[in-house]
């Protein structure tokens, strides 16, 4: 199997998000990379499912809460930008203050 660099990056996000979700299910609070991985993964999958950019931008701030992450992580992430593949092409999804 030969994957392009962009596909490898997407696969890495999936693996990182899966690991982060497993840790979260064990009751651990997420660190910065884990929180980014989960938010990124959910936005990419939402785009793949056909949700609109506007919908993802508002929904993206509900994926994780301050209670889900370690102290200070929410303050470190002021914005998440994901280049996601939609049914009609690739678009940039920006979520401001994604952890509330």
UniProtKB/Swiss-Prot annotation:
Which pathway does the record list? Nitrogen metabolism; urea degradation; CO(2) and NH(3) from urea (urease route): step 1/1
Q: What class of enzyme is it?
A: hydrolase
Q: Which Pfam families match?
A: Urease_gamma
Entry coiled-coil feature ranges:
none
Q: Which UniProt keywords apply?
A: Cytoplasm, Hydrolase
Catalysed reaction(s) here are: urea + 2 H2O + H(+) = hydrogencarbonate + 2 NH4(+)
Molecular function in Gene Ontology: nickel cation binding; urease activity
Please describe the quaternary structure of this protein. Answer: Heterotrimer of UreA (gamma), UreB (beta) and UreC (alpha) subunits. Three heterotrimers associate to form the active enzyme.
- Cited HAMAP family: Urease_gamma
This one is known as Urease subunit gamma
């Amino acid at each position: 199997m030969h994957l392009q660099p962009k596909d490898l990056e997407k696969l890495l996000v999936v693996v990182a998000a899966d690991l982060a979700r497993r840790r979260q299910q064990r009751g651990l609070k997420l660190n910065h990379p884990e929180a980014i991985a989960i938010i990124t993964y959910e936005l990419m999958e939402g785009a793949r499912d056909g949700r609109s950019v506007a919908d993802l931008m508002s929904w993206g701030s509900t994926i994780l809460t301050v209670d889900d992450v370690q102290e200070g992580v929410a303050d470190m992430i002021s914005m998440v930008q994901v280049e996601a593949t939609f049914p009609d092409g690739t678009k940039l999804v920006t979520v401001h203050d994604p952890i509330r």
